[in-house]
Amino acid sequence: MGAPRFEEYLPNYTYDDYKLWGGDWELIDGIPYAMSPSPMKDHQLIASNFLFELRVGIKDCSNCMVVSELDWKLNDSTTIRPDVVVLCDEPHDKYITKAPQIIVEVISKSTAMRDEKIKFQIYQEEKVPYYIIAYPDDLRAKVYKLVDGKYDKQGDLTHEVFQFDDIECSASVDFDNIFKRFRK
């Protein structure tokens, strides 16, 4: 006798359900994940720093934009909300419909496993060219680049300038600017 299977008892919500919920949620393979409590001040400041750095970096690229907290509807059972994304040629105005060029997630204790494992896998499968995971407690960020369908770690960055030059709108991020105000 094999191990019991419980998949049939798990909830299986859809985007239509998701739209009706109050508060902040993500929906991954039909399972809801609460995005509460709201992010701490340092989390929001670091996300804002990425938003600014990336906006400055792509300012001359008219078909790309940098946004935060916008839903990405992958299919009817998966809708996620990255912290910061670089979008190019996005036709929809209510949610993201195609893979962003760059995604930034700022880690918190409550989202670490989801950002480092589940979303890492989703972003890799969806062919997001760059995934940045920022760690406020360590004042560093891991930068991953999609190479032959798999993420290759480009480094743990703290003070460096990283150039994203093989995407539609090249950009750079000065990681010293991202973390400077938090250094003692």
Predicted ranges, named:
Residues 1-184:
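Gly/Pro/Ser/Thr-rich low-complexity, intrinsically disordered segments predominantly at protein N-termini
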